[in-house]
């Protein structure tokens, strides 16, 4: 019992932030939060607006843990970008989100449309292996990505996934990367 408790305590050092914008894909965000928290990781949802309540692409409203103005990303291991439309577009058009992603020295994970809509225009896929939701490959390629036809593409500091059906594997890849 004591060993398990210690293990969970140590895992909370793996700080992760999941951005939530109006129109986010609920499965991609909530599944990842659930998987990370079950693994003992410190996973926080961040609303990109001043309102903690964020409504997903399918009408599910979620109360985020904090807003962008309340978040301190300085010790983040992971920044996680769910997809969904118009969620991915809303993230891409938010200057604060783009700045945080570009300045982040840690790891980034993006799923569905977000590799193409959010990461590629920021230059974060340049020369990297990636996957995305079908139809967004050209955006990724424009950003310099080497496209892979796999559900989840995991490297040392970048994980991408192709959509809702890969959400569980996406979350597990983040956990495996952080905790082994």
PLM segments and residue spans:
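Short N-terminal binding/cap micro-motifs at the start of the first secondary-structure element
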Residues: 24-29, 53
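A cross-family phosphate/adenosyl-ligand binding-site feature
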Residues: 55-57, 61-65
């Amino acid at each position: 019992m004591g060993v398990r408790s210690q293990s969970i305590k140590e895992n909370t050092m793996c700080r992760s932030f999941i951005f939530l914008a109006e129109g986010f894909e609920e499965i991609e965000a909530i599944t990842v939060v659930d998987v990370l928290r079950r693994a003992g990781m410190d996973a926080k949802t961040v609303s990109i607006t001043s309102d903690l309540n964020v409504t997903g692409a399918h009408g599910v409203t979620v109360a985020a843990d904090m807003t962008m103005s309340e978040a301190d990303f300085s010790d983040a291991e992971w920044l996680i970008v769910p997809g969904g439309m118009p969620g991915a577009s809303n993230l891409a058009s938010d200057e604060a989100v783009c700045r945080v992603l570009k300045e982040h020295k840690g790891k980034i994970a993006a799923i569905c449309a977000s590799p193409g809509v959010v990461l590629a225009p920021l230059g974060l896929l340049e020369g990297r292996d990636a996957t995305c939701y079908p139809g967004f490959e050209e955006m990724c390629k424009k950003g310099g990505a080497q496209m892979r036809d796999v559900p989840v593409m995991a490297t040392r500091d970048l994980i991408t996934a192709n959509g809702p059906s890969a959400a569980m594997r996406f979350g597990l890849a983040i956990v495996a990367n952080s905790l082994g």
